[in-house]
């Protein structure tokens, strides 16, 4: 039997009594965001709304986005990436588990020097895919053109954020390229592996 979303006590400033809120709402108050599912319009809009709210609440405090996602819709992922660049506070990205496809794209969108992978995390990049092959020929051609434009956009972002040459990114996106946390660091998708941060403290 599912237990639902866990609830935790939370006391608002000035209040004597704590109220029970779901754990995600409590963590949002600490500026901790979670992408733990396929990227779709609904989760993208939730994350964007939370980032904009937290940006308005305090522009001086960083946000932290924890990612464990197999990817998802390209435009939804790009919208989350754009919102991360739009808000004033730095957005730290932390990969735990898997950041694949749009998950890795969002991971690389964190503030440079503040992108982290946990030691056993996996990262995967590949090209955007289309799911509309059963339409009219003209529609398929327009769809293919749009997919190529999206691929070009994604490639440019990876080039900018990783420092890798466009030819290498383009070549690697031809297939599913899986990386360990250390390989993702060497590739420039993340800046640190969590064990590295532990060893310096």
From Swiss-Prot:
Location of this chain's protein in the cell: Plastid, Chloroplast stroma
Listed EC numbers: 3.4.21.92
Role description: Cleaves peptides in various proteins in a process that requires ATP hydrolysis. Has a chymotrypsin-like activity. Plays a major role in the degradation of misfolded proteins.
Pfam family, one: CLP_protease
Tree of life domain: Eukaryota
Catalytic activity entry: Hydrolysis of proteins to small peptides in the presence of ATP and magnesium. alpha-casein is the usual test substrate. In the absence of ATP, only oligopeptides shorter than five residues are hydrolyzed (such as succinyl-Leu-Tyr-|-NHMec, and Leu-Tyr-Leu-|-Tyr-Trp, in which cleavage of the -Tyr-|-Leu- and -Tyr-|-Trp bonds also occurs)
Family, as annotated: Belongs to the peptidase S14 family.
Stated name of the protein: ATP-dependent Clp protease proteolytic subunit
Catalytic residues (UniProt): 101 (nucleophile), 126
Gene3D superfamilies: 2-enoyl-CoA Hydratase, Chain A, domain 1
Subunit annotation: Component of the chloroplastic Clp protease core complex.
Disulphide bonds in the chain: none
Naturally occurring in which organism (per UniProt): Staurastrum punctulatum
């Amino acid at each position: 039997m599912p237990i639902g979303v866990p609830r935790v006590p939370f006391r608002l400033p000035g209040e004597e009594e704590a109220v029970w809120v779901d754990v995600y709402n409590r963590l949002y108050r600490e500026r901790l965001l979670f992408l733990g599912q396929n990227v779709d319009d609904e989760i993208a809009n939730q994350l964007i709304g939370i980032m904009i709210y937290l940006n308005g609440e305090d522009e001086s405090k960083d946000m932290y986005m924890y990612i464990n996602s197999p990817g998802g819709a390209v435009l939804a992922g790009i919208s989350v990436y754009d919102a991360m660049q739009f808000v004033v506070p730095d957005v730290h990205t932390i990969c735990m588990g898997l950041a694949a496809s749009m998950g890795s794209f969002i991971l690389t969108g964190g503030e440079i020097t503040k992108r982290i992978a946990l030691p056993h995390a996996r990262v995967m990049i590949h090209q955007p895919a289309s799911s509309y092959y059963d339409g009219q020929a003209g529609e398929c051609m327009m769809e293919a053109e749009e997919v190529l434009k999206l691929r070009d956009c994604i490639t440019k972002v990876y080039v900018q954020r990783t420092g890798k040459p466009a030819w290498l990114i383009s070549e690697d996106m031809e297939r599913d390229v899986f990386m360990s946390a250390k390989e993702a660091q060497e590739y420039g998708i993340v800046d640190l592996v969590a064990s590295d941060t532990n060893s310096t403290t």
